[in-house]
Curated annotation (Swiss-Prot):
Residues 43-180 form the Nudix hydrolase domain. InterPro entries: NDP_pyrophosphatase, NUDIX_hydrolase-like_dom_sf, NUDIX_hydrolase_dom. A motif (Nudix box) lies at residues 86-106. The keyword Calcium does not apply. This is GDP-mannose pyrophosphatase. Nucleoside diphosphate sugar hydrolase that hydrolyzes GDP-mannose as its preferred substrate, yielding GMP and mannose-1-phosphate. Homodimer. NCBIfam families: nudix-type nucleoside diphosphatase, YffH/AdpP family, PRK15009.1. One of its GO terms (cellular component) is cytosol.
Length: 191
């Protein structure tokens, strides 16, 4: 089913860190009725994430960092456990994950497998995130990780079974991370 959409107005409300826009559009429904909508859209750019895993050790590498949006939404300390990720800026997705993995986790990504790409919150956020998995070993450790500039990132290497248990307990609550962990489990990669 294809809908006819006509842009009426695109007004920038804020360009502080990302871009918040107010979009007015007419949507012609399949019965021919034209309905006008006004929505705010948050454009933060597209991103990429990678879950590092080690079959031999049956472990994964995750990070823990402060996320202000979770804190505003009731996460008491604002800390979130998640897969390594970053915004694409002008990079290709695989270039992005390689750069972010070194910066955040300290591990070099050798061979990466793209799993899928998903919209994070399509009701109001433009972001499309490219999700990867990549195997790591001790030899691929380049530095201690921890992020750059103003980032404060803790690197967490943990058993895969513990990561899955943290999902069940509600300790890991980041959508991309849950999807990537479940992807490893569904494919039997860590068996």
């Amino acid at each position: 089913m294809s809908l006819n959409v006509e842009l009426i107005k695109d007004k920038i409300l804020s360009e502080n860190y990302f871009v918040l826009r107010n979009i007015t559009y007419d949507l012609t429904r399949k019965d021919g009725e034209v309905v006008r909508h006004k929505r705010e859209v948050y454009d933060r750019g597209n991103g990429a994430a990678v879950l590092l895993y080690n079959r031999e050790k049956k472990s994964v590498v995750l990070i823990r960092q402060f996320r202000v949006a979770t804190w505003v939404n009731g996460n008491p300390d604002g800390m979130l456990i998640e897969a390594c990720a970053g915004l694409l800026d002008d990079d290709e997705p695989e270039v992005c994950i390689r750069k972010e993995a070194i910066e955040e986790t300290g591990y070099r990504v050798n061979a990466a497998e793209k799993v899928f790409e998903l919209y994070t919150s399509p009701g109001g956020v433009t972001e499309l995130i490219h999700l990867f998995i990549a195997e790591y070993d001790d030899a691929s450790r380049a530095n201690e990780g921890g992020g750059v500039e103003d980032e404060e990132i803790e690197v967490l290497e943990m058993p895969f079974s513990e990561a899955l248990e943290k999902v069940r307990q509600g300790v890991i609550r980041d959508a991309k991370t849950v999807l990537l962990l479940q992807h490893l489990q569904l494919r039997g990669i860590m068996d």
